[in-house]
Design a protein with these regions (language model features):
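Short, exposed "boundary/linker" segments that immediately precede the start
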Residues: 1-7
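Carbohydrate-interacting regions of secretory-pathway proteins
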Residues: 9-138
């Protein structure tokens, strides 16, 4: 099963639906979702269905891993075990083009909210989170 860390718009999230930018967490070798999407954009560390993470990642299958998401204004970075995997800027023409080519194309203003909620989601496998921290950057 897949697991994701989401950021959700305060205005766009419906009570029955949680749609937002996703840091994809899964075992690329074992989960079928890693084989879907375009050019690896549904693999570990990717911005789900939008931006693929590199093929080679510092992923430890037998222990806890450290995932970090840094958001400063519209600039976002995905880190795994101290290695930056991807970075992107929301609210740009490039961002809007990525969204238009994704499964989120029908969600107005997808991913552009300045604030929202955080969601940890799993689709069926056992997954553990520990030491979850949120720090406001200045």
């Amino acid at each position: 099963a897949t697991t994701e860390i989401y950021t959700l718009s305060l205005h766009d999230a419906l009570p029955i639906s949680a749609i937002g930018c996703e840091f994809q967490i899964l075992d690329d070798d074992k989960h079928p979702d890693a084989k879907l999407g375009v050019k690896g954009n549904r693999k570990l560390g990717s911005l789900y269905d939008l931006i693929p993470a590199p093929e080679k990642k510092p992923f430890n299958k037998k222990d806890f891993n450290t995932a970090t998401i840094i958001v400063q204004d519209n600039h976002v970075e995905h880190w795994l075990n101290g290695v930056k995997l991807i970075e992107y800027t929301r609210n740009t023409d490039m961002w809007n083009a990525l969204v238009a080519y994704s499964k989120y194309k029908n969600w107005p203003n997808f991913g552009n909210s300045a604030e929202g909620n955080i969601l940890l989601q799993d689709h069926g496998d056992e997954v553990w989170f520990k030491n979850v921290k949120i720090k406001e950057l200045k």
